[in-house]
């Protein structure tokens, strides 16, 4: 089941892309351009190209059949727009529809070769894939939370902590709210976990988490809090190029993935944060959430340490993808779940997309909760296993915690 989960998660990530920028000379090409009518124009200079296309999650999705281990299933992939060549070998495509306010990832395909946009310096990495980024903000829309505004900003630090379980120091990304450095106040702590193939940078780059926190706090919609972004790959020190492995290509197939070691070691992180930062070191002032594999980790950490977190958020959680026999932490789950709820957590929050390949396992888990009368909050969105949904879930979850 875990191999199937990894394969399906891989399909949700765009292909690796690269491009070179001409630093001197050549015509100026502007791309992307958000037009006054809400459409978006993409341009790519390739005078010798035969065919240029653009694809990304701003396009309507296409459904396609895939087969894995003899099982056929339908997955959603972004649609494709074909550019037309113009003057000077500049290819252009304008969406025939208004692009809704949101944050999107896209790439070009030049004669079948994937490329990032050389005229757009905003690039994200998801595992080993590079994509160009398009942000369409609008006042009053959710995407406005993803933009940088003239509000008090928190501080983002890269912090190393000693892990006795791993046997080496490991890196965290830590957000402290505006005013932390000049205050003597203590703060609640939210721990945010990434998905398979991700790392401690994923939520800050792809997820726009620090912008979301800055804006929600500035609006008075969230309490000032410390936020800790962990690295769930217990065999790794840190994100790619930030560890002793050097120039190693990122991969989803890492040792000790979803086999209990990370969850077992999680109290090390909490202890370190409580010792280094001015935290309110008690259950009611701690929250945890995560996407996909991070949702799997969130659930198992929550039920194995029921006195640690009052708030838990599961975003497209990879429920039931590991064999209970691989770790004692995954055994006696129903008993642990009952104990977790007996201790009256403040909130269990679940979010999933209607076409997410993990939708059914999340539905089955909710049925278990319902059958036992265990309370939770639930959000169902359009779309599948995508960052668009996970950003939505974070903006919904954060205002509910530490009330």
Regions found by a protein language model. Name each.
Residues 4-13:
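Sec-dependent N-terminal signal peptides
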Residues 5, 20-22, 135-140:
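Short, basic/low-complexity N-terminal boundary segments at the transition from targeting/disordered tails
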Residues 34-403:
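Non-catalytic cap/lid and distal C-terminal segments of serine-dependent acyl enzymes
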Residues 15-19:
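Sec/Tat signal peptide C-region and signal peptidase I cleavage site
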Residues 20-38:
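N-terminal edge beta-strand
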């Amino acid at each position: 089941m875990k191999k199937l989960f990894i394969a399906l998660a891989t399909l949700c990530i765009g292909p690796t892309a690269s491009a070179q920028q001409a630093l001197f000379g050549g015509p100026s090409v502007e791309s992307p351009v958000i037009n006054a009518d809400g459409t978006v124009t993409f341009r790519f200079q390739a005078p010798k190209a035969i065919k240029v296309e653009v694809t990304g999650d701003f396009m309507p999705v296409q459904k396609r059949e895939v087969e894995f281990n003899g099982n056929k299933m339908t997955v959603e992939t972004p649609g494709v727009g074909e550019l037309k060549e113009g003057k000077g070998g500049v290819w252009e495509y304008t969406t025939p529809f208004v692009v809704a306010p949101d944050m999107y990832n896209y790439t070009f395909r030049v004669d079948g070769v994937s490329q990032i946009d050389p005229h757009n310096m905003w690039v994200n990495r998801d595992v080993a894939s590079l994509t160009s980024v398009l942000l369409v903000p609008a006042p009053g829309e959710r995407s406005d939370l993803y933009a940088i505004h003239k509000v008090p900003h928190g501080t983002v630090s890269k912090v190393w902590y000693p892990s006795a379980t791993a046997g080496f120091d490991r890196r965290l990304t830590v957000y402290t709210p505006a005013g932390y450095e000049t205050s003597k106040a203590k703060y609640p702590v939210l721990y945010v976990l990434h998905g398979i193939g991700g790392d401690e940078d994923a939520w800050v780059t792809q997820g726009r988490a620090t912008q979301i926190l800055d804006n929600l706090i500035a609006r008075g919609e969230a309490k000032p809090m410390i936020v800790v972004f962990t690295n769930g790959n217990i065999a790794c020190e840190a994100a790619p190029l930030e560890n002793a492995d050097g120039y190693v290509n990122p991969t989803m197939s890492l040792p000790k993935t979803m086999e209990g070691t990370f969850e077992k070691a999680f109290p090390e992180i909490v202890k370190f944060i409580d010792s280094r930062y001015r935290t309110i070191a008690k259950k009611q002032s701690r929250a945890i959430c995560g996407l996909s594999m991070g949702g799997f980790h969130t659930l198992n950490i929550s039920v194995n340490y029921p006195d640690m977190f009052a708030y838990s958020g599961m975003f497209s959680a990879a429920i039931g993808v590991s064999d209970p026999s691989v770790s004692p932490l995954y055994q006696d789950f129903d008993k642990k779940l009952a104990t977790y709820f007996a201790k009256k957590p403040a909130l269990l929050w679940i979010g999933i997309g209607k076409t997410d390949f993990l939708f059914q396992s999340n539905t089955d888990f909710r049925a278990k909760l319902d059958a036992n009368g265990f309370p939770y909050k639930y959000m169902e969105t359009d779309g599948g296993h995508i960052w668009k949904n996970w950003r939505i879930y974070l903006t919904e979850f954060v205002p509910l915690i530490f009330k």
